[in-house]
Amino acid sequence: MQDIIQSRREFLKKMAITGSVATLAASPWLSAFAQPSTAGKSPSDRVRIAVIGTGSRGKQLMRFLFDLRETNKLQITALCDVYQPHLQEANNMCKKQDITPVLYTNYESLLNKEKVDGVIIATPLHQHAHIAIDCMKAGIHVFCEKSMARTLDESKAMYDAHITTGKILQIGHQRLFNPVYLEGMQRIHNGDLGQLGQLRAYWHRNNDWRRPVPNNSIEVERFINWRLYKEYSAGLLTELMSHQLQVANWALRKTPVSVTGTGSIVFWKDGREVNDNVALIYSYDDGTQFIYDSMTSNKKYGLEEQIMGHKGTIEFETNRYYTETPPPAPGILQLINDMESGFFGKAMIGGASWVPETAVKYNGEPIIENTDFYDSALQLEGFAKYIRAGKAPEALTKEGYNASIWTLLGEIAIETGEKLTLAEKYRI
């Protein structure tokens, strides 16, 4: 894994050093990768990290920290989780890496007792805001998993705490560090796709999204499967769509002006409270629309973000670029030549409907050639670099905030059945 991370790091470094002014303006968070390596610094100069929330995502991020700790001089000093099985699993992972973090079941005790430079918050969504705010007030930089918070007010309070304290607040939108997306966005912003008319994204699964509950305990069911209950999460919206809405905002370099949507529980009638399928339309001030849908009972189309302009299309998840004028296949080219030369004589053609307007059969071309990378590792490396610098590009925080706030407004639009705009007090 370290070799893969190194190759992608070099890609980002090259983009940061050789990229155009427009590229760095659109992705200013890349600038950190143009700085010299910190590997030669003394052991006392290690960036001290605490992980709050050691469930599945927290442990996944820890694995990346293990691979980054030497090249970036990171030290995992403490772990915190209210659920002992998760905490012990994470501690066992550390032991295998000869790491001995201090364990906590209360994050406030961690803040009072440990000296840390940064925290990684990977708790359930409804816990993000108060933990992040307390950390920033304690003088600690924050990496918080997406979405930002459970409510509009909590999200704004997090952003305000970031402004007031001057501490880093990075939200976990790893696509911002993904070389495919960075290269694709450069093409979009350079005008390679022409005028953008519509953006579409979807995330389709075919499972109930439930996690196993020890002994089928009713007491811990909501605790383990928090994504399915409105008190803790907006389900498909905050856990999935927020990623793809961030991509749409990034491509357009703006935020929506309105949202409308619908959703229901049509398949998994198992006691969950969040919708198992949703569809939304976000409109922008130039008339461009971002059309989104997500479902949990069919996975044929998987997930994708499609950025469509009059000159071409980019599909990020599959790493493809499609021009609107693809080169003709050899057989078609021969047919055209034969018709132009009169080989077939007169041909009767029944008008414009002669060619059905089905999907174009064209495989496109890759956005980049090598896609062996871990964007979640690259975003954590960026976090470490920002901690050393004492600041992060404000655009990075705004990307996370705007994606989160408009995701939550989308939830309200579905619940009310209304077309909504964002109140002025939430705009930044």
Report each predicted region and the residues it spans:
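C-terminal helix-rich "cap/oligomerization" subdomain common to oxidoreductases
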Residues: 14-43, 120, 350-354, 361, ...
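A structured beta-alpha segment of the ubiquitous adenosine-cofactor-binding alpha/beta core
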Residues: 100-121
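Beta-strand-loop-alpha-helix segment that lines the small-molecule cofactor/substrate pocket
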Residues: 124-125, 129-177, 191
